[in-house]
């Protein structure tokens, strides 16, 4: 199994999603820094086909429910049904 590689971009802001989850759905396309040897501070969650978090039991994201997009992206605390 090959290890997933995320871009290291010293001098750029760190990818907040990567720091929390240890994953980044943008992979090599992400413009932020992904430091090696990080320990995620939250458990990973499942993402829907748009890369938004599925959080069963949480309130549905009001922006996503209304417009089909989410301003907070993968860091949103609300559920994004499929």
UniProtKB/Swiss-Prot annotation:
SUPFAM superfamilies: CCCH zinc finger. PROSITE patterns: ZF_C3H1. Transmembrane segments: none annotated. Keywords: DNA-binding, Metal-binding, Repeat, Zinc, Zinc-finger. It comes from Arabidopsis thaliana. The lineage of its organism: Eukaryota, Viridiplantae, Streptophyta, Embryophyta, Tracheophyta. One of its GO terms (molecular function) is zinc ion binding. It comes from the Eukaryota. PANTHER family: PROTEIN PHOSPHATASE RELATED, ZINC FINGER CCCH DOMAIN-CONTAINING PROTEIN 67. This is Zinc finger CCCH domain-containing protein 13. Pfam families: zf-CCCH (PF00642).
């Amino acid at each position: 199994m090959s290890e997933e590689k995320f871009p290291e971009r010293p001098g750029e802001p760190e990818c907040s999603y990567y720091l929390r989850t240890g994953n980044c759905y943008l992979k090599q396309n992400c413009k932020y820094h992904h430091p090696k040897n990080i320990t995620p501070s939250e458990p990973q969650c499942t993402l829907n086909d748009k890369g938004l978090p599925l959080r069963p039991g949480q309130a549905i994201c009001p922006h996503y429910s209304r417009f089909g997009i989410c301003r907070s992206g993968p860091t949103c605390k609300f559920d994004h049904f499929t």
